[in-house]
Amino acid sequence: MGVASPLPNTYSAFFGDAAPPTVAAAVADRPLVSPCQSSASNGRRMAKICSISLLVVLSLSILNASASGEQQKKVRQKREWIIPPRKLRENVNYMYLDYIAKIRSDEETRTSIRYSLKGAGADQPPRDLFTVGSTDGKVKINGLLDREKTPVYYLQGVAKFLNGSNAEKDVDLRVVVLDENDCPPVFNLTIGAVSELSARDTLVMSITATDADEEGTLHTKIAYSIVEQSHAEMFYINRETGGIYVMHNTLDREKIDSYTLTVKGTDMNGAPGGNSGTGKVVINILDVNDNVPTLEKNIYECRVEENTRFVEVVRIQAIDADLIYTDNWLAVFTLVSGNEAGYFSITTDKKTNEGILMLNKELDYEELKEIRLQVSVSNKAHYHSSVVITGSKTYTIQVSVINQPEAPRFKPAVKVITISEESTTVILNKVITNYAAIDSDTMLIATNVRYAKGQDVDNWLIIDEKTADIRLNKIPDYESVFLKNYTYYAHILCITNETPAKTATGTIAIQVKDFNDHCPVLIHQSQKLCYEEHVVFVTAEDKDHFPNAHPFGFKVNTKHTKESWSVEHFNDTAAIFRSQETLWPGVYHLSVDVWDQQGKVCGAQLLRVEVCMCGAEKVCLPVTVVSRFGGSGVLLMLLGLLLLLLIPLLLLFCLCGAAGAAGDFKAIPFDAKEHLIAYNTEGQGEDKGMALLHMSKDENTRTNVGTVGGAQKQSDGKDGAVTAGGSHWSTFYHYDQFNNNAYHHHRDRTDGDFMYAQRKDEHSRFENYNAFDGLALSDAFLGNYYSQKSSHVAQKQALGDNLKVYEYEGQESRAGSFEDICSLMHEEEDLAFLDNLDMKFKTLAEICSGSTIQRESINVSSKKTESKDLSVQETSNILQSQEKKSSTILAGSVNQSSNMQQTSQEKKTSTIIAGSINQSSSLQHASTGVYLQEQVMLPNTTLLVQQPALYYAPAAPVYVVEPHPTVLVASGQVLGHQENQKRPKNAKHETHYQSLVYVEQQQPLRESQGSISGAVHMVNTEIMQSTEGHGVRREIRPARRVMMEEVREREVDSLHLRVPMSL
């Protein structure tokens, strides 16, 4: 697609410019081919015609080149015209033309094409200024162009098929608007300024007019001129630059303060026919200090009262023609003469430009009745160079003083008195002077007045109220701190008796003459002297002054000085004391006489000289204090040794051991004290939903298990009947009998879950502690204390009621026997326990019986035995996926399987306390490693038990017993312990009874897994344990039978138990 001018494409393509209209009309419809490109069939004859035609066309093109300069050149490139900018003049009517340009597509030879334009001036504002024929592609203009609004129009020609698709790529059409001189120059209001009295050719300002025509052409080249001036011609303008200059140096702001000029600008550089424009220029005249200020009058008269000050005397107005409120206008007043005493001052009021005369000091009518002042005036700014001042003009101000009634006054204002400080020449209460005031008007002594002291800091003076006689109240002191330059000042007041009263003030100055009333004294009473040195500088001072002070004389009083010293003069106030021999380190005292210039001495003075060892700096070295062991220290040491010897003797009178001190045991108050009779509570209500707590199998978890006596056989690790169960980690046991099986199942589901979770947490925390962490007391003390504590707890629990066991109907278990319940009901009313009360009731019993009750004690012997530590691994009731295992360790004969190995054999020292139970509290914190036990009184029955081994350990309790085949127990009530645990299904349950052995200081042993089964031999004591409020309660009662019966399976938490085993 191409864009064509009104000329044929043939000529545009070949020559770049439009052909003449005649030629264009002739070849408008010819194809874009040269005549030289005709077929070869024309022959040579046609060649000559072609050559002639080409020469004619070429000649016409060259001749018409200047006329066709406004036509756009077109270059055909493939199927698209690239058109240089097309130029149209503004304000020219091109609407009569058939078209100003033409666009065509080569596709129109094959099909119908629709042409359109887009861009500013076509489909954008200003809309429809340019239009195109939809079928012929002719571009027309529909209005006049304005270059000042749009200098160039950027259009795009569009060719589309009838279906709306593009037939060609859009072609750019740029229309350039040529400028015409249609805009006149425009001026803006311009304001300039110049100082008055400026010299000729002084540049005031430059003005510039604007022209909207095309820049850089004659259409915008402006020539300036002044058309009119408001006053006389004082300025001229540069024709080309527009600069305005001063024509005459007679500008005077006081006459004309501004000028208004009318300036003209013509484009085309002022040529005829150019456009012109005018504007206004305002020039302000700036002020300079070319006027000297003056006053309204030459002489001013005023009056002022005496004895007044800081009052305004008169105002004088300054006149200045310069610009108001500027430094050229502001006046400066100067007192030239008449104010030598400084009575007056003059200032300027900046608002009114007035001079204000002020009175600063009081005037005395009797001394000065009239003052004549000379004043000059000038400006704050410097005068202009045109101002010539030959001499300063002065103005006169006449001031008259008005007499006023005055108060009396002291004359002189300061009265000086000279007095010696020598007490023999001063007589107190004697008149030393009279200081009466005078009348200011008559100059005679004032009457109708009274006198008083105004200021007397040291109370030296006494004044007579009526006569003004001055007396001394104390002896003057030349060394007094109240003296200033050896003069004491006091103020005397004279007060009139009229109303209002008037006051006059006078000053008494007492000059004190020095008297030699002080002796010279040593400044430093103590001096230090380095060893092997001999010189000490001694300095004295005297409060008196010359000639009653220095120079001083020094002398050593040999009568009171042991060492030999000589004195040398150093200066007027100091002397050199030289030792005649070398002094050893120590303190020496010298008696020194010192006298002043007048020979006054007040007795010998003591000088302390300390001789010490010195370093390189000649400074005494610090003295090392040596402590010696004196007699008092020896006595204290002997007393301490005697006390150490006395303490073992006192211990002989103390009761030691658990049996002997059972009644005097004082438990550490960790728990609240209980009452004598403790009542049990019923089991908790029905709890249908209990979540199972699963615990993974861990081979590294520590577990302690208590053991009871009996016979057992260890299996090979598979399921078997369990004779007795162990507890997980702590000594928390479950009592399980046929008649109370269901009840304890309910208790385990409530309190047991809580207890297990707490034991699990204690166990995990205990893993981080060593065997002796947290242990602060000795092993002997702890062992004794635990033994007494356990005995006390056992006895205290024995006094309570027995636990009543009921069937828990919510569990599908077989009903047990109620025989034990009936027996317990009879035992509840049994008050036989009151016959064997604790020792704390001993005093009450003695009061009631009226006699002294003797305590019974049992001596228990012990012997060293060898024991083997046995540890067994037990795993109980791992739900669905773990094997059901349980194990326990029983004191008695033990048959071990082949998978258990002997790890160590150690000799242990063990002791059994007959009749007492040492049990570990499972609720103690595992990290402390300390378990408190209480002490109980033993019953009167006798208990014989074959002695096992006893071990102490600060860790969790582990019950280890040496294998003894036989346990012998005497008849009667025996304290024991039972251990019970939930067991898997089809497990055998049996209860074993035996005295409890408390083990402490268990050594870490190797571990082995295994399960133990066997039979247990019953003895005549059984233990029942229950949980109340998350605590452990045990009951002890006589046994009735051996309970061998199948135990129902309980749904309890999966527990993993580890029991240390030693072979």
UniProtKB/Swiss-Prot annotation:
Entry's Gene Ontology cellular component terms: desmosome; plasma membrane
Membrane topology type: Multi-pass membrane protein
UniProt xrefs under CDD domains: Cadherin_repeat
Gene3D superfamilies according to UniProt: Cadherins, TCF3-CBD (Catenin binding domain)
Domain of life of the source: Eukaryota
Keyword Transmembrane helix attached: yes
Extracellular side: 1-632
Positions of transmembrane segments: 633-653
Entry keywords, A to Z: Calcium, Cell adhesion, Cell junction, Cell membrane, Glycoprotein, Membrane, Metal-binding, Repeat, Transmembrane, Transmembrane helix
SMART domains cross-referenced by the UniProt entry: CA
Compartments, as annotated in UniProt: Cell junction, Desmosome; Cell membrane
Disulfide bonds: none
Domain writeup: Three calcium ions are usually bound at the interface of each cadherin domain and rigidify the connections, imparting a strong curvature to the full-length ectodomain.
Protein name: Desmoglein-2-like protein
